[in-house]
Amino acid sequence: MIKLKNFLNIYNLNYKYQYKNKINLYLIRQGLNINLIKNLSSNIFLYMFIYNFKKYSLKLLNIFKLPDWNFFDCPNINYDNIIYYSSILKDNNLIYYLKNNLNIEFLDSILIKNNSIDIIFDSMSILHTTQYFLKKLGIIFLPLFDIIFKYPLLIKKYLGTIISYKDNFFANINSIIFSEGSFCYIPKYVKCNFNLSTYFKTNSSDFAQFERTLIIVGKYSYVSYLEGCTASLYKESQLHVAIVEIIVKDYGYIKYYTLQNWYRGDYLGNGGLYNFTTKRGICLNYSKLDWIQVEVGSIITWKYPSTILKGKFSISNFYSISFISNMQIADTGSKMYHIGSYTKSYIISKSISLNNSLNIFRGLVYIKPFSYKSYNYTECSSLIFGNNSLTVTIPYIKNYNNTSYVKQEAFVSKIEIIYLFLLMQRGLSISESISLLIIGFCSDIYNKLPFEFNLEIPILFSLKIKDIFN
């Protein structure tokens, strides 16, 4: 037993973001009821529409139930005994804290000069860098609750229009509790050449992060948005329930990147973060929405970014890498709803399952009767290696228009011993050989990331494989 404990401690040392930041925090821990909403809304009572939005969501809570169609049992979460709000007290020096505790080393680097970054720590935004030139263009990129104070009519107009509090169980809970997030508004005829980024970090034990992101892209506009996520290491699990709403108006274009490296738990499946996220966008005439995501962390992932192609000639692309191992479960995929005519969608998914992991891909393509000459192409490729690895593909196609066309392809393969043998004959170790094969398998997707992150993904994969096979 002592040897096993020491072994797990060594394994956990390899998780880069395991450190916990010792800092004074204001915490709210109580049951999921109206008193919690009042505590969370104490500073926004001037804007009753937010309070009412949360209150109406609470009234519908008992209507919903946890999904019962998953390949895994949803964890039994005690919603009366978790921390719903965690914020840094004002007596802390935030910049000193960031540089010395959070280990965010890019604050003084060239990277921040080409990005506008919002850093959300637990339940509050602790650093926001909005470039002066963005303000001159009329671009609004601020923490969600700053927007509520500064532009309440804008929030009232768009909040919950794409993902209602009636949508599903987790969307309903987020609508009750959401405490922070990001808001982005790109005016019409504006091409944003800066990368807008949000970094989420959960730090407190028994903490649940409920953030909400809302992005509006105006007519003939363009923006690139990236979110990154990490979590501290605890024996107890943490919870992350998020909502992302995206509205792309006529001729608009957005690239939405996601890099998630939450804590994945130990080799026995203890600890780790539960990630339940609802993401959805709507595209109007001639607009385009790209989802590009890389999933590495979290013990359980439940996420299906989807697009409503409402306008004619609208396009949506979904590119995903899901890389899991050692008791991790990823139930992910995408949904494409074709409503307008001449719409196109592409779903390209790459999943890698190593040692005792479960990877599920669900793809829904729905083409309505009045969506003429629309097209979808779905390709799901899976790679498995090690003991007790499982990958599952569940396509679901509804095509109600005989002028529209859907194409589906799926591949499952394993890392052949002969390939490893050939690489090891040339001086590579077992972990280096596996890394080379996996990186080559999914390079066409991570190459779509911005240059700075494109370089880091192979390193991240190599480190994870080295932890497993060395």
From Swiss-Prot:
Pfam families with a match to the protein in the record: SUFBD_core (PF01458)
Induction: Expression is not affected by oxidative stress.
Claim: 4Fe-4S is one of the keywords in the record: yes
Domain of life: Eukaryota
Species the sequence originates in: Plasmodium falciparum (isolate 3D7)
Function: Participates in the sulfur mobilization (SUF) pathway for iron-sulfur (Fe-S) cluster biogenesis. As part of a complex consisting of SufB-SufC(2)-SufD, involved in assembly of [4Fe-4S] clusters. Exhibits ATPase activity.
Record keywords: 4Fe-4S, Iron, Iron-sulfur, Metal-binding
Biochemical pathway: Cofactor biosynthesis; iron-sulfur cluster biosynthesis
Single biological process term from Gene Ontology: iron-sulfur cluster assembly
Listed InterPro entries: Fe-S_cluster_assembly_SufBD, SUF_FeS_clus_asmbl_SufB, SUF_FeS_clus_asmbl_SufBD_core, SUF_FeS_clus_asmbl_SufBD_sf
Family to which this protein belongs: Belongs to the iron-sulfur cluster assembly SufBD family.
Protein name: Iron-sulfur cluster assembly protein SufB
GO molecular function: 4 iron, 4 sulfur cluster binding; ATP hydrolysis activity; metal ion binding
Quaternary state and interactors: Component of a complex composed of SufB, SufC and SufD in a stoichiometric ratio of 1:2:1. Interacts with SufC. Interacts with SufD.
